[in-house]
A protein has these predicted regions:
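Terminal intrinsically disordered/low-complexity segments used for targeting and assembly
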Residues: 98-106
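Amphipathic alpha-helical coiled-coil segments
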Residues: 1-81, 88-99
Length: 106
């Protein structure tokens, strides 16, 4: 009986340790993806302002239309990167929820 109880206690302790490790790992991943999304969000705002300024310069005759197109392309690429970063953040959030015991099926 004592051997069975000790084995059960050991199995329980290992399960708890594994669960805590999963939570720690997914929390690190979620925090990284959140920070990356915030960084890309700032970058996107900068590209949006750059595109707006290029358009203003073009309307004022100070630059060619190629600069407008280039800055718009950079802005749109950044928007795409932001959408991908947001998707990764949400995916990592779901993984964290599941690691914490949430019943989200796959």
């Amino acid at each position: 009986m004592k051997v069975e109880r000790d084995a059960a206690e050991l199995a329980y302790a290992q399960a708890v340790q594994h669960a805590l490790g999963d939570v720690a790992d997914t929390l690190v991943g979620y925090n990284k993806s959140r920070a990356y999304r915030a960084e890309v969000e700032e970058e996107t705002a900068t590209y949006a302002e750059t595109a707006r300024l290029a358009n203003d310069r073009y309307r004022g005759g100070a630059t060619g239309f190629l600069e407008v197109l280039t800055t718009q392309q950079q802005y749109l690429n950044s928007e795409l990167q932001l959408a991908q970063a947001g998707s990764a953040e949400l995916r990592d959030y779901v993984q964290l929820y599941r690691a914490l015991g949430g019943g989200w099926g796959t």
